[in-house]
Curated annotation (Swiss-Prot):
PROSITE patterns in UniProt: COMPLEX1_20K (PS01150)
Signal peptide: none
Classification of source organism: Bacteria, Pseudomonadati, Chlorobiota, Chlorobiia, Chlorobiales
Transmembrane segments: none
Binding site for [4Fe-4S] cluster: 39-40, 104, 135
Name of the protein: NADH-quinone oxidoreductase subunit B
Encoding gene (name): nuoB
Keywords (A to Z) from UniProt: 4Fe-4S, Cell inner membrane, Cell membrane, Iron, Iron-sulfur, Membrane, Metal-binding, NAD, Quinone, Translocase, Transport
Length: 189
């Protein structure tokens, strides 16, 4: 009686789709790199403090883009800073995700109309997966956004584009309130 004849009746054998195992590993060990530029950075730092304990979600902040798989852009992005944001994004390994935190990084904030030096949303230079609104958003909102990124990762499949994963997430009935997801093809002006 060989291994194939015995089957998989033993309790110590794990049989699961490769997608599920890879996605579980990715969403259980999210390594964000914070790119704090203004007031939202204070709330992002508060979220990383002991009161909210992001490590219980498997989220370990990193300072290097080469070690992170999530970029959190928090605050006002000026035209000069946009080049650095793109450079840091390109240094991140695949798969990479972007969370835009606060009104300034989402749409330019209070500077959008009269500020010639302010980028009118970070999604004009890099693709954004999850938006967290607020000025500045509370740490609870950021945690909710991080959990939304984890839901996006859970829905991905090998060979599936990010657009398809967003559509699949919407089909499951998970409402993104107060978070807004956008398709990656519409990002980047």
């Amino acid at each position: 009686m060989g291994l194939l004849d015995a089957g998989f009746s033993r309790d110590n054998v794990l049989v699961a789709p490769v997608d599920a195992v890879l996605n579980w590993a990715r969403l259980s060990s999210l390594w964000p790199m914070g790119f704090g530029l203004a007031c939202c950075a204070i709330e992002m730092m508060a979220t990383n403090a002991s009161n909210y304990d992001l490590e219980r979600f498997g989220i370990f902040p990193r300072s290097s883009p080469r070690q992170s798989d999530l970029m959190i852009v928090a605050g006002t992005v000026s035209m000069k800073m946009a080049e650095r944001v793109v450079r840091l994004y390109e240094q991140m390994p695949e798969p990479r995700y972007v969370l835009s935190m606060g009104s300034c990084s989402n749409c330019g904030g209070p500077y959008w109309e009269h500020g010639y030096h302010v980028l009118k949303g970070v999604d004009r230079v890099i693709p954004v997966d999850v938006y967290v609104p607020g000025c500045p958003p509370r740490p609870e909102a950021l945690i909710g956004g991080l959990m939304k990124v984890q839901e996006l990762i859970r829905m991905e499949q090998i060979g599936m584009s990010r657009q398809e994963a967003l559509k699949k997430l919407a089909e499951t009935g998970v409402e993104p309130r107060p978070f807004i997801e956008r398709e990656r093809s519409s990002a980047g002006a």
